[in-house]
């Protein structure tokens, strides 16, 4: 377990749609997330431990540590991005490309299958990436861990320059 005191100048402002939005910090090669409701950090830690026993490669998931941030429970992970890389959420990518709120666009579709296919097509057309395997792994893990907080601001791609 770690214990870290972090000043407000390390806070990373992230706009999101989630009710469970946690305060996030980036400091000394780590991302820190302070618990908002009490056990988010423990859940991240336990799921990352579980992932070590799956068939996924080490570069397909992030390992978390439990600890305290400014005296409050939370977790941290090593920064997995290189200096020239940026994490781009599906939400932000769609807004930048189309100028609309992707969550509102897909909310008007009748079935979950239509919503998923729409997002898959958009990513393929805008980035040239097939995300079927990625989504399959993420959504399978969500079902196993009973994650109810999957949304378009925590599904993302890594961008390096203009390439994904």
Please place each PLM-identified region on the residue numbering.
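Conserved ATP-binding subdomain of kinase catalytic cores across diverse folds
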Residues: 1-103
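Conserved kinase catalytic-core segment
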Residues: 114-164
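Amphipathic, charge-rich alpha-helical segments that serve as recognition/docking helices
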Residues: 96-122
